[in-house]
């Protein structure tokens, strides 16, 4: 609700905050960031973040728990700078051979920014289809924005998916 504040303290995880709707202010590490649109915001895992709703806001939080040694990997190999911020409309767009020409795929958090994690989106309009495919070494979660309604085929079984739903695609499943 407008005026609400949430404080997230450092844990053994990354707080991946996806603003779905509304206006929000993030305060972390002595800086403030204000957004009025869809955005992904990931504070440093060792930083406290205050989240203030400037309007009625909807945020999806993913807590991605760290494994031993990943802090060293972040510093040495990934060189990720926090907070990690990706405005949705500015996310890198790409084409996928399994998807139609009217489908827009976006990379919201590229791989090798947070160990074992990447975040993308698929956007289309009207009737559309994606060819069945699998990811033999990848678990996936699908989140449907509020303007979406679809059926997702998982291992050839239709699963209805409506607005603001999170769906788990098990490791190696055909979808």
Regions picked out by a protein language model, each given a short descriptive name:
Residues 54-74:
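A short hydrophobic beta-strand segment most commonly corresponding to one strand
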Residues 8-37, 138-163:
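A short beta-strand-loop-beta hairpin characteristic of the jelly-roll/cupin
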Residues 70-99:
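Segments adjacent to and within acyl-thioester-processing domains across lipid
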Residues 113-122, 130-175:
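Compact recognition or signaling/catalytic modules
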Residues 1-7, 97-139:
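A short glycine-rich, His/Asp/Glu-containing loop-to-beta-strand
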Residues 10-11, 53-55, 135:
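Short glycine/proline-enriched turns and hinge-like loops at secondary-structure junctions
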Residues 1-3, 18, 23, 57-58:
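Beta-strand-enriched, solvent-exposed domains that form extended recognition/catalytic surfaces
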Residues 35-53, 64, 161-175:
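Conserved metal-binding segment of the jelly-roll/cupin
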